[in-house]
Amino acid sequence: MRRLLIVLLTLWAACAAAYTPVKFERAPRGKYRVVRIYDGDTFTILVPPDYTFNIRIQGIDAPERRQEFGMYARVYLERLIGGQDVEIYPMETDKWGRTAARCFNHEGKDIGLEMIKAGLAWYYSEYYKDPKYENEERMARAAQAGLWCRPDPISPQAYRQAPTAVKRKYQ
């Protein structure tokens, strides 16, 4: 009896030692719940059982949180996907560890495309090529939608590189 107990305990210890939880390098493809909206192009999802991943919407660059139109972009993204399930198609991991992904809401709408249509994001052609995104940005500019109502809006990339004094001017 004692020998059986030792064998069982040894087997249990070996199994416990061999068990390592799955660790993802980036969010896996699938449908997941949005648990936080950071800004107009970044949000956090929950992957069961309890993994969280920061997702960067592929192909767009939305105004920064403190930049003009930044809060509008964040609120609009919240309305599109906040607290809902989104389908993500991971493309790559960026230098900040976020999963850059194509994202679709529960209605099947392309989230990046919706942000561009609303005039609340730039088409980020440097990292993603999609003629639909380019065309929708052209149409949003022509309609002066969202940030395009300004004669020369500052891109998020230019805003990030600007000195603090310049940033204060555009908040």
Positions of the model-derived regions?
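Small beta-barrel nucleic-acid-binding modules, primarily SNase/OB-fold domains
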Residues: 2-171
